[in-house]
Amino acid sequence: MDMTLPFKALIVASRAKDHLQMSASAEPFFARIAAENHFAVDFTDDAETINEENLEQYQVFVMLHLAPFDMTYSQQEALQEFIESGKGWVGIHAAGLAGKAFVRSGTRYWQWFEEFLGGVTYSPHPAYQKGTVLVDDRRHPATQNLPPSFEISDEWYEFNGNPRGRTRVLATADETTYKQNKPMGDHPIIWTNEGYRRAIYIGVGHDPSALTNEAYCILLRDSILWAASAS
């Protein structure tokens, strides 16, 4: 790591067909915000980089649509140790695909990750459409520079259960602004797990159009900067 830079982030993107366009657009986006904010970044779609030895050089890990079931048992263990050691984690969109329905044959279910996510599991989302994010907590460093609400076109992830009460909810989906699959009512879409030093989940950000959304770009930037902060 260049010692003139304050921290280094590893961004591991999904190889899933549905997310290839986002991954391709995200690489130059993250390179730009790293340069503008003076930190180092490595971007890859190779999950083999998730190992204890390699992760030692990073202060922040970003799961860009990489689902928990995309990782092997040893990769899951390495990431869990990374998070439990107090380093930063930013999970984007498909990073929240927790649930036993997704366990692959011959593999175990990563129960720790479900609890880390706030004790919720993914429920099938409605059609891609425009909706509104309501920023509930503008005191948090990740959301303090956001407007009270912003529109975004996305897959509005739904969950079995509500993380509120087990996490600090920063923003909710305004279900009156789009057609839901299974209405949640109170619908957290961005939250942090304060049981860990620096961990934030961002449920929106399905495709490259999100990277042209000013509020969303601010959210990603500030989430990474917060996840890397020492205080």
Locate predicted features.
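Short aromatic-enriched loop/helix-cap "lid" or pocket-rim segments at secondary-structure transitions
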Residues: 22-24, 55, 101-105, 182, ...
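Oxidoreductase and adenylate-handling cofactor-binding alpha/beta cores
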Residues: 112-118, 148-167, 206, 216-230
